[in-house]
Amino acid sequence: MNYCDKINYNIYSTEKAGFEEMVDKLLAQLPRDKQIFRLAFFGTPSDNEQYVSRRILLREKVRKYYGNHEPVLTYVSQPPLNGGLLLEAHMYTPDEGDHITYKHIGTFPYVLLENGSGRFLFAGGFHGDVINFGIEQQSKEVFKLVSDLLRKEGFPINSIIRQWNYIEQITKFDGEDQHYQIFNNARSDYYAMTTWENGYPAATGIGANLGGILVDLDAALFSNPDCYTTPIDNKLQVAAHAYSDGVLEAAHCKKTTPKFERAKSMTFGDRELVYISG
């Protein structure tokens, strides 16, 4: 079966109730016949102290629920459109050619998939100390975590094909420095450690009410010549990584551009999966 048929994304919601009850109801909706790679919860904590305590509770519940098959866990402080808590699940239906390993780096779970197409990494929930540090320090801490994981598993930086970046109060300024630009500068510094001949990742870079800096990513190393990635841009738009200084805010007198493509496709033989940025 083709990778495009085996990977699956779904959204689950539940009506407003106590936080623990909502988490239990969402976990109970997840299918038992699939491998769960990523769980991204979206909710509305009242402050960062409650955000951290709920993130810890989520981790405990997910670990108890999945045991040695703990998926990537992300908690985003954004109000769901409907219901009290929303869950985005990334799932996979393996066949005999797939080898799936659930691992940890520090306290962060991640998933490795290996098959005839290549090696695939699903990771995230990467965050810094949202209580005691600002956006700049958190951004540096997050990319240090990303770097450590990629190095550990043998994935080059430019193997990242999709990245999700959630930034607390994204347009807010710390003095003269905008949160989004602070994050962009940290990302640019990290990405500058390699070359990107095949384009930057597709990416989400959006605001969150709370939670500091939060990053998820997918990476791929292909071993089959019929499998590859292709960057996609819109000719009616300026590429994000080519923005002029006029549309960027400065942070520490730096105006590095957002490093992402409008989309990126993964080809598997005669099939394609497209990651759309936004």
List PLM regions with ranges.
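N-terminal presequence-like segments and the immediate start of the first folded domain
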Residues: 1-164, 169-278
